[in-house]
């Protein structure tokens, strides 16, 4: 009997599990691995989890008023409830950054996995992350894409080229790459 799936549902469970897998394979906490392999060598000075450990509260923009779980304005702590239950350290959410740092990561993706002459990801990995992978979803492996069937649906402008990819955050942030026009857009 063949199963027929007609719709997809966005879920962050896969990224929570991916974070756990990274820890198992790296033999260290995900945060330490990311710091060693990406943040430090890429010069991402303001990127990481639990920013109150490194920065004054006054340097961190309040992200949201949590009326459900913590019942306070969140500043320096993840808004996503699932990540909050993991102490703010999960593969799906909780990463704080600046527009400059996010732009460097997206520029690295636009460059096919390298920046400043240093390779961080293979071209094939970048292609896999940013190419639509399903007929029932407009997503790549982690990135949103324009909806080819109905350009007015989704998070991209209707005139966006099909090659565009990006991601929106839980608190209204977004970052996009337009490979055709060699543009990186970040709004935090």
Regions found by a protein language model. Name each.
Residues 2, 6-163:
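Short, surface-exposed loop or secondary-structure junction motifs
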Residues 21, 176-177:
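Hydrophobic beta-strand positions
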Residues 169-171:
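Short, small/polar residue-rich loop motifs at catalytic or cofactor-binding pockets
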